[in-house]
Amino acid sequence: MHINYYTKHIDLEEEISQEMEKKMAKFEKFADEATLIDLTVEGDLPKKSVKVSLHYNDATHSFYACEEAKDVMTAFNTAKEELFTEITRVIGKERDQSRSKARQAKETIRQTS
């Protein structure tokens, strides 16, 4: 009797996509909940270099942003956006690697069937 394992694994890429969407939703929530733990303003007017540290899930992320001195919160929001962009890039890379592994697994299953 021949069992076709390939059909069982055919939705693996879809499962990976759904998992990555869950991760993205979690980090979208982070973008609203990140806590400002340190903000250091250095330099002279009219521009300052603003160091913004964000803390989330036991990790601290620091960014420097050169902003007009009038609005330091802009630097904080910019740092959150930059962090979210970086997280998105990392998740995209993870997704691509997972999809590649899924394709390899499918090919291996197909060859051994």
Regions found by a protein language model. Name each.
Residues M1-S113:
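N-terminal, polar/charged subdomain of small-to-medium soluble alpha/beta proteins
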